[in-house]
UniProtKB/Swiss-Prot annotation:
Keywords: Calcium, Calcium channel, Calcium transport, Ion channel, Ion transport, Membrane, Phosphoprotein, Transmembrane, Transmembrane helix, Transport, Vacuole. Disulfide bonds: none annotated. Residues 1-236, 317-335, 398-405, 458-675 are cytoplasmic. The chain crosses the membrane at residues 237-257, 296-316, 336-355, 377-397, 406-426, 437-457. It comes from Saccharomyces cerevisiae (strain ATCC 204508 / S288c) (Baker's yeast). Required for release of calcium ions from the vacuole in response to hyperosmotic shock. GO terms for molecular function: calcium channel activity; calcium-activated cation channel activity; potassium channel activity; sodium channel activity; voltage-gated monoatomic ion channel activity. It is a multi-pass membrane protein. This is Calcium channel YVC1. The lineage of its organism: Eukaryota, Fungi, Dikarya, Ascomycota, Saccharomycotina.
Amino acid sequence: MVSANGDLHLPISNEQCMPENNGSLGFEAPTPRQILRVTLNLKYLIDKVVPIVYDPNDIVCDHSEILSPKVVKLAYEACGGNPKDKANKRKYQSVIIFSLLKVCEWYSILATMEVHNAKLYETRNLASQQLCKLLIEREETRDLQFLFMQLLLRRYVINENDEDQEPLNALELATDMHCTTVIGSSGFQRCLKWIWRGWIVQNGLDPTTFIKDDSLAEVSLISHFNPVRLKAPVYQNYLQMIFSFLFLGLYTLVVNGKDSERVQSFDLLESIFYVFNTGFILDELTKLYYIGYAHLSFWNLFNDTTYLIITFAMGFRAMSVTPLNAKYSSEDWDKISYRVLSCAAPFVWSRLLLYLESQRFIGIMLVILKHMMKESIVFFFLLFLIMIGFTQGFLGLDSADGKRDITGPILGNLTITVLGLGSFDVFEEFAPPYAAILYYGYYFIVSVILLNILIALYSTAYQKVIDNADDEYMALMSQKTLRYIRAPDEDVYVSPLNLIEVFMTPIFRILPPKRAKDLSYTVMTIVYSPFLLLISVKETREARRIKYNRMKRLNDDANEYDTPWDLTDGYLDDDDGLFSDNRNSGMRATQLKNSRSLKLQRTAEQEDVHFKVPKKWYKNVKKCSPSFEQYDNDDTEDDAGEDKDEVKELTKKVENLTAVITDLLEKLDIKDKKE
């Protein structure tokens, strides 16, 4: 959407994102062939800028001589467009991050295909990521809305090998490729934070586009009491955590609550527990159906194993209370059921980590475990080959006399040797001296060589993550955020509440689409009402601060913290009552606090005429600081020239308006005190 002064803003309604209203998004996206040309131009630029292998620190360091301001300017120019038409130029510059990430993908493919040049392609890959980071951080200070709407969130289609690829945005592409340098940039993280909070949401009419939540600055409780707000990843995460702890509590009561040898029928808690498990299974099957094999990951398989064990236990439990003639008695089925259910305890407790990974410590720990599991594949592959070879040798020794005598003990001993519990006694009287020689070799290889290889692999994986812990954690959170916004459901029924949706699906199919949507809306409002009330209270307080920021012409996420080094930041939300008729009390209190703080500070500094630092001191400080003028200059001089006068004019207007509002608030405060 284009404002009166030519700036781009996120659309705030579904209708603005309809195909017939593409102009309201600022401009139409470039065609797939045009995006391919931009990507080829950027690849040519990186090839020339990085002709040889450089030290990675020379590329990623601040004010790098390799990725100089001139390179940044050339990257913008590689997008083409009319330099005299800002809208036309921005249209093609909007794909620059997407195209650079595609270049990264191409370099990764080349590094795999041409191993002899892998180091060079990895260096170019890093240079492409760093250039993305520089561009994102530059646009964050110039045009935040353009960064979010066009560069990171808009989905583009590129033509590769004469075929149009699936639409993707830069946010998804960087996360899928694990580009930690790009993900770790401040603008990227800021965009993720807005999506995580639900400030930017998917368009209800077209899930491939994003819009700004239109209730963000609404200061009434009822405007935020809306189940649509549950689409925000932060609230879905909270709901999943709540249901996970409830699931754990129910499991504990069920598995440790049996106090009789007699077979008892299903009680209320046990029934609710198995309903929870059924809801989780249904959710996994739904996601597998819509997403396919891409849904399968370590944690998904881990959860599936948990649900499968509990399902077996539920089946055995049903057998124990069903009056059927079976091989075993009801008591035996009941005993088997509780024993199988007990085996799920480590899984049920460990799955909590999946929902607590948003905490930095747990998130980093999970990333370390993930890397260790990947590294251990090498160990287990080698171990498998070694075990197969020695097992075949021992079985050959056992069958040399035409019969097999100790096959079972041999296999058992070879297996427990991996755990350090192997015994030489099994082979003392078996095919001397061949069996002993074989086992000595096996024991040495497993205990000395392979186990030390495993330790070294784990140490490498740990060090790799710890050295890059912050970026790895941010990449993990990016993946977590995308899991929520890529969910197939338009209505949020968090497991096990998805069973409600299943039971009501026949009714939804019968009703007209609008009536079905209204019914679903009503059901979600009733089911989630306690949680929606908490959301409303939280977001209403945030809305007052956002409204204050917009009055001050600041970004919505400004003034979240009251820092001691800035006397004019922060917001006094304590002065806002949830049911107060005066919705501007917090704004007034904040304005008065700021003016009072500045006045007190100014008065304290003026008590001693010799206290004030001379202006010359500031000039000397600037002189002694390192000079990065050539890096700090805005290389898009045309844009700077156009915006300079406009910024000055707006600054004057804001200062005048702030002064008027401050005086007015002081007068109102005096008037209220008199009354």
